[in-house]
Curated annotation (Swiss-Prot):
One family name in Pfam for this protein: Methyltr_RsmB-F
PANTHER family per the UniProt record, alphabetical: 28S RRNA (CYTOSINE(4447)-C(5))-METHYLTRANSFERASE-RELATED, NOP2 YEAST -RELATED NOL1/NOP2/FMU SUN DOMAIN-CONTAINING
Listed EC numbers: 2.1.1.178
PROSITE patterns tied to this protein: NOL1_NOP2_SUN, SAM_MT_RSMB_NOP
Protein name: Ribosomal RNA small subunit methyltransferase F
Major place of residence: cytoplasm
Gene field: rsmF
Organism: Shewanella sediminis (strain HAW-EB3)
Length: 478
């Protein structure tokens, strides 16, 4: 059994609702988490994924608050993260409770196609990619991460999941209220926290728990929430979430925001967000998810509406200069569109921005037009292709983000494994060479290969090549 920090137990006992049992909390904290996944609807429907994986022994139990989330039971010890289906972005390994904040963000049905949304603390990318899927890759999603090493992980997951409507930033998120004041239709602040709710995943999470440290964390959370509120448009929605359990990092932080902007802050009740949500609902309408309620990680979710204008707290910063991208010429645009259509049967979206930098051709979300110059961006949209002396060379990320389902040369599982291990694929009766083409598995793009007649020449980027791939219906590896 996990040995819980006794100072933590004494402190959390004051915050636990009277109808919940500390014995149950300790018991559930000692149990391993049920593994859970979220199906990536940018690439496959949940119905099709379930039908696809059932013959492989995957039993999927619906998570009540996320229609694309499932607890998973397997017939054998499959290494989920090393399966072809995971590497090609058909699903994300995501804890069930962490699917709640994006669901709360979109609890009110709105037209997301025109929305500009901010994910203030994004890495590793589970909620960012969930939001992008819920937006169906439309609109604009700004994904920020303060840690430089975690930005790389975030980008890798955005690429793997086929997300194209996102721009990445690398800032202390306290700057957003200043630089992008009154800019966003919706904001998710999944704030850095003490991690009290993650004990089932990380038995060492509470080893260094201390009230003084948590109080310092709460002050940072308050500053981040104020920044988010200033960056939010009037009438917009803000979700504040943590994987902490104490009121100090949750209710108290939200109450601080209301006391700071009393006329503008309204708490929206989440009591009807999903069946039995009321079991975790507080008097304020927040969801305070304790591990024993839904057999999950601990989590906190609050939804806040900005009901009236709030004055800018600092003068508007000077515009950023020397933006390195320029719009491509109409001639090059036509050639680029023809190349993608004729070679890969891909129609480049017409509403987005086609930009160039040093013979690199990029697709920016249309919503970026109003943000260029206001802030520096780490990476915007999708890199489509590199310019050659004659023609173009498509980039892997463009193919996996823009290719339609079932467009390409379908591989068997054995061939897909060989492809992801960077190997060429021999062909029997391959016919005449066909040049560049998309290779797919389960009808979803894996990448590009060059058809040489007798084999498919592998062009997978070296940083994506894996030494071992797990069989998704057994624990053996190739």
């Amino acid at each position: 059994m996990v040995q819980l920090n006794q100072d933590f137990i004494k402190s959390i006992a004051k915050d636990m609702p009277a109808h919940l049992s500390m014995d149950d909390f300790i018991s559930y904290s000692s149990k391993p988490l049920r593994p859970s996944i979220r199906i990536n609807t940018l690439k496959i429907s949940s119905q099709d994924f379930i039908a696809l994986m059932a013959p492989k022994g995957w039993t999927l139990e619906p998570i009540p608050w996320c229609q694309d989330g499932f607890w998973i039971s397997l017939d054998s010890d499959v290494q989920l993260g090393n399966t072809v289906e995971h590497l090609q972005g058909l699903f994300y390994i995501q804890e069930a409770s962490s699917m709640l904040p994006p669901i709360a963000l979109f609890s009110t049905k709105t037209d997301k196609a025109e929305h500009t949304i901010l994910d203030m603390a994004s890495a590793p990318g589970s909620k960012t990619t969930q939001i992008a899927a819920m937006m169906d890759n439309s609109g604009l999603l700004i994904a920020n991460e303060y840690s430089s090493s975690r930005v790389k992980v975030l980008h890798a997951n955005v690429l793997r999941m086929g997300v194209s409507n996102t721009a990445l930033t690398h800032f202390d998120a306290r700057v957003f209220g200043e630089y992008l004041y009154d800019q966003f239709d919706a904001i998710l602040l999944d704030a850095p926290c003490s991690g009290e709710g993650t004990i089932r995943k990380d038995p060492l999470a509470l080893n260094n728990w201390g009230l003084a440290e948590n109080s310092a964390i709460a002050e940072t959370q308050k500053a981040l929430l104020e920044s988010a509120f200033l960056a939010l448009k009037t009438g917009g929605s803000l979700v504040y979430s943590t994987c902490a359990l104490s009121k100090l990092e949750n209710q108290d932080v939200c109450e601080h925001l209301r006391s700071t902007f009393p006329e503008a802050v309204e708490f929206e009740s989440l009591a009807t967000l999903f069946p039995d949500a009321d079991k975790a609902c507080t008097d304020e309408g927040f969801l305070h998810v304790w591990p024993q309620i839904y057999d999950s990680e601990g989590f906190f979710i609050a939804k806040i509406t900005k009901t009236c204008d709030v004055e800018r707290q600092k003068p508007e910063p000077k515009r950023q200069k020397n933006f390195p991208f320029t719009p491509i010429s109409s001639k090059v645009e036509l050639e680029l569109r023809q190349y993608f259509k004729q070679t890969f049967d891909i129609d480049i979206p017409t509403d987005d921005m086609l930009m160039v930098r040093d013979l690199e051709y990029w697709l920016f979300p249309a919503g970026m037009k109003t943000l260029i110059g206001k802030m520096r961006f780490q990476r915007i949209g999708v890199k489509l292709a590199d310019g050659l002396k004659k023609g173009f060379k498509a980039r892997h990320e463009a193919i996996v983000a823009l290719a339609e389902k079932s467009t390409g040369y379908e591989l068997s599982q054995a061939q897909a494994i060989q492809y992801l291990m960077g190997r060429d694929i021999p062909l029997v009766d391959g016919g005449k060479p066909q040049g560049e083409l998309i290779v797919t598995y389960h009808g979803s793009a894996l990448g590009v290969a060059k058809h040489l007649g007798s084999r498919l020449k592998n062009t997978l980027p070296r940083d994506l090549v894996r030494d071992k791939i797990a069989d998704s219906d057994a624990s053996t590896t190739a």
